[in-house]
């Protein structure tokens, strides 16, 4: 799964009538799939693309659960 597909899947999941926990679980599953599909032969550009998609997913999570989303974003080193 490339980052564009992941972002589209995340947007679709975000719009489904799921509980907050189910939505967050689905978004984190998409994020995990992206990282599972990377390896030592993944280029720097592809890795940066995956990181940007991850940040997008974490911002969606932040919209559902501020604290959880903020911790994920901080873990990526995107904020102080």
Mark where each language-model region is:
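Alpha-helical propensity feature that highlights long, continuous alpha-helices across diverse contexts
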Residues: 1-80
């Amino acid at each position: 799964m490339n980052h564009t597909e992941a972002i589209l899947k995340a947007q679709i999941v975000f719009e489904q009538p799921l509980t907050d926990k189910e939505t967050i679980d689905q978004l984190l599953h998409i994020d995990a799939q992206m990282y599972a599909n990377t390896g030592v032969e993944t280029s720097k550009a592809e890795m940066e693309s995956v990181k940007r998609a991850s940040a997008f997913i974490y911002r969606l999570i932040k919209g559902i659960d501020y604290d959880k989303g903020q911790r994920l974003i901080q873990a990526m080193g995107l904020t102080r």
